[in-house]
Amino acid sequence: MAFKKLLAVLTAALSLRAAQGAAVEKRATCSNGKVVPAASCCTWFNVLSDIQENLFNGGQCGAEAHESIRLVFHDAIAISPAMEPQASSVRGADGSIMIFDEIETNFHPNIGLDEIVRLQKPFVQKHGVTPGDFIAFAGAVALSNCPGAPQMNFFTGRAPATQPAPDGLVPEPFHSVDQIIDRVFDAGEFDELELVWMLSAHSVAAANDIDPNIQGLPFDSTPGIFDSQFFVETQLAGTGFTGGSNNQGEVSSPLPGEMRLQSDFLIARDARTACEWQSFVNNQSKLVSDFQFIFLALTQLGQDPDAMTDCSAVIPISKPAPNNTPGFSFFPPGMTMDDVEQACAETPFPTLSTLPGPATSVARIPPPPGA
């Protein structure tokens, strides 16, 4: 989405909040005493309690949270104005990946999402909410469970999808940078900088299906924290593979136990995106601000923001990220500036400290049940 469209989305959201704030009679007090912009938001507190206990294991930033965040992107990005009128009923963030899961979770880029869809479906049925709204809500709550994440926005009002999204709309890790930039521009006129913002989600992510023999390989050494360490470690020279070396979409990583996607490697080094990538290193405030912005835009792809209800008050506030160094980012033990493959020609790479101690392996994340 171009900046002017992103600004329009945010302006609409803020205008809606202002209108709701001015019309006091439209606000509601839920049974738990929380005041929300509309009575329809109250049901989401019940959903929140349920999924925190029974999906996210008491509010953890684990595999179920990671896959819920992934599901938001894979549902939303599957929209293509360029395919109109063939896909005229496909509305991006509409829950089609859950409604038509037997079709969409068999698409190659969606492999592995059938498990989180299976885990989420009973909550949709139990609470009587739409799949599109639930996917956005679960993703926002999942992020709130990860220390360092922004205060997430959540709007309701997504009608159920009436047809599955076409195949071929979700970027793959083996796609070229050109292909991925073109795909996100087609989906919502997102530019190359906003693509980098989206990939901030890989700060709290792991691969379950790139290597068929090993699941739960994190993309950075702090997969339970929403921080900029992902943007550091993707710029370090690769030294080996945790599993096999012939997996499509994987390149060598700098740390044992870590998975590096080919697409992340290339975007971190492409002239169009390298400086934006580097800009997140040691800059937690920018990371938080930009991701909050892009997450809202993704969850409203194909929707009319003016027709949606702001229920952001239901989303918990994340804990702050632990401050390992003054700026949050660091070099893993045994690594220094000499290991950086810097691609941004405009600004120097930030000065970072190296964590003390011997080099260690990144621990795997147990995948969701049934994965």
Curated annotation (Swiss-Prot):
Residues modified by glycosylation: 283
Alphabetical list of SUPFAM superfamilies matching this protein: Heme-dependent peroxidases
Catalytic reactions of this protein: 1-(3,4-dimethoxyphenyl)-2-(2-methoxyphenoxy)propane-1,3-diol + H2O2 = 3,4-dimethoxybenzaldehyde + guaiacol + glycolaldehyde + H2O; 2 (3,4-dimethoxyphenyl)methanol + H2O2 = 2 (3,4-dimethoxyphenyl)methanol radical + 2 H2O
EC class name: oxidoreductase
Keyword Metal-binding part of the UniProt annotation: yes
EC numbers on record: 1.11.1.14
Residues the record marks as active site: 74 (proton acceptor)
Positions of the UniProt region annotated as Disordered: 349-371
Keyword Signal: yes
Marked site (Transition state stabilizer) residue numbers: 70
UniProt protein name: Ligninase LG5
Higher taxonomy: Eukaryota, Fungi, Dikarya, Basidiomycota, Agaricomycotina
